[in-house]
Amino acid sequence: MERVRFHGIFCDDMHTMHALEDVFPIPMETGVVETSFRQCAAAYDNLLAAGMKPFVELSFMPQHLAKEDVRGMFFYRPNICMPKDDQAWIDYIQSFVRFLIDRYGQEEVESWYFEVWNEPDLPVVFFHGTREDYFHLYEITARAIKEVDEKIRVGGPSTSGSKWVKSFVAFCKEHNVPVDFVTTHQYAGDPLGGVSDQGGPESAEETAVDEAMKEQMSNVSPEAVQQMFANLPKGAILPAIRSFMGDPLERDDVPDNVFRTNAPIVKEQAQGLPVYYTEWNNCATFSAYGNDTRKVAAYDVKTILALENVIDGSSIWCFSDIFEELHPFPEEFHGGFGLMTQSGIKKPVYYALEMLNGVGDMRYDLGEDAIDNEVGMAAFASDEGTQCILFRQKMKNNLDLPKEEAEISLEMDAAPRMVYMERIDQEHCNPLKVWEDMGSPQVPNPAQAAIIIEESEMRAEELPFVYEDGKVKMSVALGVNDVYCIRIVK
């Protein structure tokens, strides 16, 4: 992991702008407003101290700069409006950039990426405006940054579902707007129709979806709300949320190839600009039970293996369950997006990435269909030998299906010294099962957390093999969404 991206560096709880009437209950606007980036510095100081760099997401709008007081739907209620005064926003952005340069040095800040906003294509959720509004916001922001330091990299449009890229790049070229890279997001299932942006004004399809979302969120009657939430389970919030949100990937038939299909299209639409998927993962539904299972591990491994040579960088959303879009859940396992729980317990997807991080730099060409099917494999070479990543990936956790036998055969000049494997399956690297087996303690005490970590940590175990006729042969049985790493030591 080299860079960290997060929402809300300009949210009001970061205290970047305060007026006198925020401090004292003065019933008027005094015009006394101060700007401070002290808490922004605290966040970036910690990242740099950990050996990482920020991928700066410029979001959201400080209330004192906002055109309206319209808040996003999530728990932290960001202001999602355009600025009421372009010049005030420009001055604010330039003050921020100058602060960063003064604190960290010009060369350091020039090594960062600055991404304008987050998912402006999602009305009600993240942006109160049109696509044209966002393009204007991007233009004034990018120009403001470049006026301070033309070497600082800035990009967008940071959309969901691989959208707006073609029209965004066309806008920047037509109006000579600075853009150094393209960003977008993609979760499985959004949008199922693929990339719809054709470079012109908002399509009728996209406009209809946006308007329907606004209508649905803004004009729900009190009676409909009462009916929707009449029979919620009482007590904890998590069961209540799950009762009406559910797990779409278990409920619906969602294809597994939307990201793999859309990324090459976006790469072409970017017209040579670097492409970064700054958010992606298996499921976009926070609280879905499957987010804590090995289903995410299998999907992410398959996707990474398919796209490593297509895009320039990506960020799985997100690193930790310390994440408050739907409030800080008390349950240790609550379907969060994180690779780790709030207590630092590693989930199956963490171990899957650890497997990938441990393979050699040279990847063998096994053919185009090696990873396209339910059972797939990739092989790598290092000085120590050969590593094979195997997976059995399905969008649903059909754990009652019989295991699939996978036989591996590799040509080698001599018998290997040893063969061992690491595996993610029902009994290995499965902290959710350990937690549930101990009674699902809401907040595990230190001793319980230590047990979960110990019993679910990834372990190497010897794998029997046969060497004959210049080939080493072995076999494994893969359950649904299992991931194996086989290491053949020369």
PLM feature segments, named:
Residues 1-2, 6-7, 480, 490:
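Mature N-terminal, pre-catalytic/accessory segment of carbohydrate-active enzymes
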Residues 182, 255-266:
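Active-site-proximal cofactor/substrate-binding loop regions of enzyme domains
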Residues 287-326, 414-454:
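Substrate-binding clefts and catalytic carboxylate motifs of secreted carbohydrate-active enzymes
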Residues 372-439, 480-487:
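Carbohydrate-binding surface patches
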Residues 443-490:
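C-terminal beta-strand-rich structural cap/linker in extracellular carbohydrate-active enzymes
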